[in-house]
Amino acid sequence: MVNCVVRNWQGEDAGQAELDLKVANEENAAHIVHRALRRQMNNARQGTASSKTRSEVRGGGRKPWRQKGTGRARAGSSRSPLWRGGGVIFGPKPRSYSTKMNRKERRLALRTAFASRAEDLVVVEDFGDNLSRPKTKDLLEAMGRWGVNADSKTLLILADKHDTIYLSARNVEKLKLILASNLNVYDLLAADQIVATQSAIAKIQEVYSD
């Protein structure tokens, strides 16, 4: 159970918000969150790194010198991995890095990661109506009133897409905006502070509670 004070646009206390999520037990929490994080980062890899072996490098068909009698080491190709311009031994080839993890485990890891950041969570009332037009300055001032440092990495969680908030937030270097339905372990762990609207908390409870 996570209990948070809800702040309004002016930064004043405006009530309480509760979030009741089933999390992993203490012995397994770090392990399951780590697995989910590795899965997410592995699945983000393109896997297109490629190098050429000695048989794929252009040239090298002619034997550089005869086998015996020169006093030099034997050489059958100028594209040997030992030579400059030669092929690569055990280099990367295109492959899939995708990692499987059961859906129930993924959701448990996500809930556990979110609950672990409760101390860094700031819950605010829905403030879309307070921004009559896109204005980054107004959003930064509001974050200051909420006790959020704009110079630290901040994750802003909304229930639904709001164009005015998006346009106001996109020019803030260390502020990342995501929807409650798109929560992921990496963003939750990478942020120094997390700001969530009341409706986003309700959406998280609805979508991720088991």
UniProtKB/Swiss-Prot annotation:
BP GO annotations: translation
Known function: One of the primary rRNA binding proteins, this protein initially binds near the 5'-end of the 23S rRNA. It is important during the early stages of 50S assembly. It makes multiple contacts with different domains of the 23S rRNA in the assembled 50S subunit and ribosome. Forms part of the polypeptide exit tunnel.
Quaternary structure, from the entry: Part of the 50S ribosomal subunit.
GO molecular function annotation: rRNA binding; structural constituent of ribosome
Top-rank lineage group of the source organism: Bacteria
Start and end residues of each stretch annotated as Disordered: 41-80
GO cellular component: ribonucleoprotein complex; ribosome
PANTHER family with a match to the protein in the record: 50S RIBOSOMAL PROTEIN L4 (PTHR10746), LARGE RIBOSOMAL SUBUNIT PROTEIN UL4C (PTHR10746:SF17)
InterPro entries cross-referenced by the UniProt entry: Ribosomal_uL4, Ribosomal_uL4-like, Ribosomal_uL4_dom_sf
Keywords: Ribonucleoprotein, Ribosomal protein, RNA-binding, rRNA-binding
Protein's recorded name: Large ribosomal subunit protein uL4
Secretion signal, residue range per the UniProt entry: none
Annotated organism of origin: Acaryochloris marina (strain MBIC 11017)
